[in-house]
Amino acid sequence: MSSTAVVHGDDLMEPTLQSILSQKTLRWIFVGGKGGVGKTTTSCSLAIQLAKVRKSVLLISTDPAHNLSDAFGQKFGKEARLVDGYSNLSAMEIDPNGSIQDLLASGDSQGDDPLAGLGMGNMMQDLAFSIPGVDEAMSFAEVLKQVKSLSYEVIVFDTAPTGHTLRFLQFPTVLEKALAKLSQLSSQFGPMLNSILGARGGLPGGQNIDELLQKMESLRETISEVNTQFKNPDMTTFVCVCIAEFLSLYETERMIQELTSYGIDTHAIVVNQLLFPKEGSGCEQCNARRKMQKKYLEQIEELYEDFNVVRMPLLVEEVRGKEKLEKFSEMLVHPYVPPQ
């Protein structure tokens, strides 16, 4: 699947992300890594390159820090919006902890809780929240539903730092647990709850318990279907971003092992913030740091010899704004050549 470049007579993996751009069957691309390693810059740059070869690209940030707006210098929200200067690249920032009530409501904006005053409070919400991760799972499912209906050719996820990155793989199970709990409640108290809710004007959007269950079931189906796609290497790949330091390398190895255990394809690593001091440079710190980075780079190349390892330099300025991102993105496909 990945193209190769011949160097000194040996077959080595090409040190670029060209294989991802060339793989036209890809629909989902995840970009993940430890905090502060340049994930957002990498995902924005990859999306810019994809926009050159694909009809429509959507870049989604699921990181609560939401750095896409800062990177492009343009405000994004929970609705997909075209990135200034592009006709086929859109971006959106979603809150992975969106309210479950918002998700279950069918657009009804009534602020009154129909169960308030009955001593039940936010019973449905409390019930759902009692299952760890259900809120995030439903939020993610809702986004996937929206994304599917928008029919973008390829979707790039700028994910939250490593700990949260792979949570989406557990979401179908989480939603099944929530459904089982709500189904049990419905079979025991359904008629009574529906009559109480009916008297109080129903749930938001005029739904009853059964409709609420159907809504959750459809979200679960969506997320299960997409999860199947996530495990198909023709449709999904994961780009790991790191820096040449021990902790980042350790996190990357842990993440790759976890991705492999879930059956998710990963064959590309972007190593950011590399120093290339000029020969004879008198900068002690630069030379010492470069020596350390070389050691970890060698380990990365040894561990991941069948990966596309992309080496990106540490730049003197922040990579912010369309022009700088475009310049940076070129180095993902044309390897950086350090000045002598």
Swiss-Prot record:
<dbReference type="Pfam" id="PF02374">
    <property type="entry name" value="ArsA_ATPase"/>
</dbReference>
<feature type="binding site">
    <location>
        <begin position="34"/>
        <end position="41"/>
    </location>
    <ligand>
        <name>ATP</name>
    </ligand>
</feature>
<dbReference type="GO" id="GO:0051082">
    <property type="term" value="F:unfolded protein binding"/>
</dbReference>
<keyword id="KW-0547">Nucleotide-binding</keyword>
<feature type="binding site">
    <location>
        <position position="272"/>
    </location>
    <ligand>
        <name>ATP</name>
    </ligand>
</feature>
<comment type="function">
    <text>ATPase required for the post-translational delivery of tail-anchored (TA) proteins to the endoplasmic reticulum. Recognizes and selectively binds the transmembrane domain of TA proteins in the cytosol. This complex then targets to the endoplasmic reticulum by membrane-bound receptors, where the tail-anchored protein is released for insertion. This process is regulated by ATP binding and hydrolysis. ATP binding drives the homodimer towards the closed dimer state, facilitating recognition of newly synthesized TA membrane proteins. ATP hydrolysis is required for insertion.</text>
</comment>
<dbReference type="GO" id="GO:0000750">
    <property type="term" value="P:pheromone-dependent signal transduction involved in conjugation with cellular fusion"/>
</dbReference>
<dbReference type="GO" id="GO:0044183">
    <property type="term" value="F:protein folding chaperone"/>
</dbReference>
<feature type="binding site">
    <location>
        <position position="245"/>
    </location>
    <ligand>
        <name>ATP</name>
    </ligand>
</feature>
<feature type="binding site">
    <location>
        <position position="283"/>
    </location>
    <ligand>
        <name>Zn(2+)</name>
    </ligand>
</feature>
<dbReference type="GO" id="GO:0005085">
    <property type="term" value="F:guanyl-nucleotide exchange factor activity"/>
</dbReference>
<keyword id="KW-0067">ATP-binding</keyword>
<dbReference type="GO" id="GO:0010038">
    <property type="term" value="P:response to metal ion"/>
</dbReference>
<feature type="binding site">
    <location>
        <position position="286"/>
    </location>
    <ligand>
        <name>Zn(2+)</name>
    </ligand>
</feature>
<keyword id="KW-0813">Transport</keyword>
<keyword id="KW-0256">Endoplasmic reticulum</keyword>
<dbReference type="InterPro" id="IPR027542">
    <property type="entry name" value="ATPase_ArsA/GET3_euk"/>
</dbReference>
<keyword id="KW-0378">Hydrolase</keyword>
<dbReference type="InterPro" id="IPR025723">
    <property type="entry name" value="Anion-transp_ATPase-like_dom"/>
</dbReference>
<dbReference type="GO" id="GO:0005524">
    <property type="term" value="F:ATP binding"/>
</dbReference>
<dbReference type="GO" id="GO:0071816">
    <property type="term" value="P:tail-anchored membrane protein insertion into ER membrane"/>
</dbReference>
<dbReference type="GO" id="GO:0009408">
    <property type="term" value="P:response to heat"/>
</dbReference>
<feature type="active site">
    <location>
        <position position="63"/>
    </location>
</feature>
<keyword id="KW-0963">Cytoplasm</keyword>
<comment type="subunit">
    <text>Homodimer.</text>
</comment>
<keyword id="KW-0862">Zinc</keyword>
<dbReference type="GO" id="GO:0034599">
    <property type="term" value="P:cellular response to oxidative stress"/>
</dbReference>
<dbReference type="GO" id="GO:0042802">
    <property type="term" value="F:identical protein binding"/>
</dbReference>
<comment type="similarity">
    <text>Belongs to the arsA ATPase family.</text>
</comment>
<dbReference type="GO" id="GO:0043529">
    <property type="term" value="C:GET complex"/>
</dbReference>
<dbReference type="InterPro" id="IPR027417">
    <property type="entry name" value="P-loop_NTPase"/>
</dbReference>
<dbReference type="InterPro" id="IPR016300">
    <property type="entry name" value="ATPase_ArsA/GET3"/>
</dbReference>
<dbReference type="GO" id="GO:0006890">
    <property type="term" value="P:retrograde vesicle-mediated transport, Golgi to endoplasmic reticulum"/>
</dbReference>
<dbReference type="GO" id="GO:0006620">
    <property type="term" value="P:post-translational protein targeting to endoplasmic reticulum membrane"/>
</dbReference>
<dbReference type="GO" id="GO:0016887">
    <property type="term" value="F:ATP hydrolysis activity"/>
</dbReference>
<keyword id="KW-0479">Metal-binding</keyword>
<feature type="binding site">
    <location>
        <position position="320"/>
    </location>
    <ligand>
        <name>ATP</name>
    </ligand>
</feature>
<dbReference type="GO" id="GO:0046872">
    <property type="term" value="F:metal ion binding"/>
</dbReference>
<protein>
    <recommendedName>
        <fullName>ATPase get3</fullName>
        <ecNumber>3.6.-.-</ecNumber>
    </recommendedName>
</protein>
